[in-house]
């Protein structure tokens, strides 16, 4: 039928729901009816319950832009307002306005890991004695949302890196959109592309990638510096914390939201 992918979800121990998206020109109602009959016959022969098959036609839509109508301004922490670049921001006294157009990159401020990192940056830069002269590295910058937040919260200079060229492009666009061109340096790559030692590092990617990077964090973070790490599931936190401690970092706080967590660590 031309199906290029499918998803499955278990309901209890004996039920599974399978979703498949089929290109309409390549499949007809007669084909679907024949598929339903074939599944029924196979189930009866195997002595299994007869599966239910349902289908509906989905009209063509520009999925790359239709999501925008569902994304609204959001307040994060006590100091930030994240606003889609195509909307007028609501009144925001006492908050920094962060305008964002993520494009194809990760990071809109809605995911728990992004929110945890934003709140941690606020604590470090505005609640930890100020951000005057502080430099920050954003590893795996995605849309650039964490770099933007760090700069808006007072960081003197932010170095944003990502291996994805689309993320680099998105970060540069959002940097310029927020008038932060002179304070955020963007490069394609990883830790080796951070040009100088920094006071703090934020990294919101995947736990496995973070584990591989931990031994190298001390090469780019100054003595007495700090880390903000997320993209980590609760069940992965212990392993990440142990790796940090093995590399002379102390986990100062673990913040949780749903199934995700954020580790705040400092150098021993």
Language-model features: where?
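Conserved short alpha-helix immediately C-terminal to the canonical SAM/SAH-binding motif I
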Residues: 166-170, 209, 236
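Hydrophobic beta-strand segment of the Class I
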Residues: 201-202
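Conserved SAM/SAH cofactor-binding pocket of Class I
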Residues: 104, 108-190, 194
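Short helix-capping segments at alpha-helix termini
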Residues: 41-48, 154, 176-181, 223, ...
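A short glycine-rich, Lys/Arg-flanked "PGG" loop and its adjoining helix->strand segment in the class I
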Residues: 214-226
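Active-site capping/gating segments
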Residues: 233-268
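SAM-dependent Rossmann-like transferase core, predominantly class I methyltransferases
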Residues: 60-130
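N-terminal auxiliary segments of SAM/dcSAM-dependent transferases
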Residues: 1-92
């Amino acid at each position: 039928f031309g199906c290029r992918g499918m998803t499955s979800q278990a309901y209890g121990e004996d039920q599974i729901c399978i979703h498949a998206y089929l290109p309409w020109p390549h499949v007809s109602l007669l084909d679907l009816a024949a598929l339903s009959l074939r599944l029924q016959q196979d189930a009866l022969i195997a002595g299994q319950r007869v599966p239910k098959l349902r289908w509906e036609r989905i009209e063509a839509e520009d999925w790359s832009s239709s999501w925008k109508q569902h994304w609204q301004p959001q307040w994060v922490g006590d100091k930030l307002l994240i606003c889609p670049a195509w909307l007028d921001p609501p009144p925001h006294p006492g908050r920094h306005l962060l305008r964002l157009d993520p494009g194809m990159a990760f990071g809109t401020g809605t995911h728990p890991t992004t929110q945890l990192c934003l709140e941690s940056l606020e604590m470090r830069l505005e609640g930890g004695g100020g951000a005057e002269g502080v430099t920050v590295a954003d590893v795996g910058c995605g849309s650039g949302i964490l770099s933007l937040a760090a700069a808006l919260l007072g960081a003197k200079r932010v170095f944003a890196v990502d291996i994805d060229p689309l993320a680099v492009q998105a970060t540069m666009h959002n940097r310029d959109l927020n008038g932060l061109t002179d304070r955020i340096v963007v490069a394609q790559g990883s830790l080796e592309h951070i040009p100088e030692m920094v006071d703090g590092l934020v990294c919101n990617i995947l736990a496995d990638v973070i584990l591989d990077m931990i031994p190298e964090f001390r090469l780019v973070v100054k003595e007495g510096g700090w880390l903000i790490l997320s993209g980590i599931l609760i069940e992965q936190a212990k392993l990440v914390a142990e790796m940090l401690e093995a590399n002379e970092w102390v986990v100062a706080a673990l913040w949780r939201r749903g199934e995700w967590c954020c580790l705040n660590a400092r150098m021993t």
